[in-house]
Amino acid sequence: TVVFYGDKNNWFAAWGAWVFNRYGVQDVRLLDGGRVKWEKDGRPLTTAVPTFKQGNFAVKKIDRSIRATLIADVLPAAKAAVKGKADVKLIDIRSADEYNGKVFAAAGFQELAIRAGHIPGAINVPWGSNVNADGTFKSVADLKKLYADKGVDGTQNIITYCRIGERSSLTWFVLSEILGYNVKNYDGSWTEYGNSVGVPIVNNAGTIWGAA
């Protein structure tokens, strides 16, 4: 068993869990609520760094079914959405301002893409919507309703993305590991898509270009 935990509602911990799943590690879990919940519950902390014997894990098979790529998955979905024929649910989990193109990155982070906006056909369900105020995951019923209200009920193929794939890993974890939906995480995310030449982009704020 491998348990990941971290800050910011486990967003980077979820990315680690997604990577481990991709490379075939068995029984990968997230600590519900992460470090913040652990501290609030008064659980013990230490500064000691543990040591372990060297393991012998070897990657036997890469799970390509949980990773979306630009050419094979994302661009076809975007072009289909432009034509009104989308059969894949794209979920942009960034903030509403990032999604609409009002800002190029979340506060405190440098955007690496030259354009702002979102992928055509993508709906916006910010990653923080998956958790309660204490950072723990919402109930299965609440999560199903959250996504059903956006037209996602598990009957479609789903692709999640954010800026670099870490926040979207949390949504991937929720949809895949908690709800059991068929979902891929696009780890290239907006950093790759927003820098790609000739791809369709939706920008609701009129601020498409971040650099000349």
Annotate each language-model stretch with its function:
Residues K145, T155-G206:
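C-terminal soluble interaction/assembly domains
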Residues K60-A68, A148-D149, T155-I158:
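Extended, charge-rich low-complexity interaction segments
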Residues L45-F57, D142-Y147, N203-A212:
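A polyampholytic, Gly/Pro-enriched intrinsically disordered region
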Residues A78-G154, N195, G206:
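Positively charged, proline/Ser/Thr-rich regional signature most characteristic
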Residues T1-K85, K102-V103, G117, R167-S189:
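Thiolate-centered catalytic microenvironments shared by cysteine-dependent enzyme domains
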Residues D7, D92-S95, R163:
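Short, well-ordered beta-to-alpha junction loops that form the rim of enzyme active sites
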Residues L30, T47, D92, N124-P126, ...:
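Structural signal for conserved beta-strand scaffold positions within catalytic alpha/beta enzyme cores
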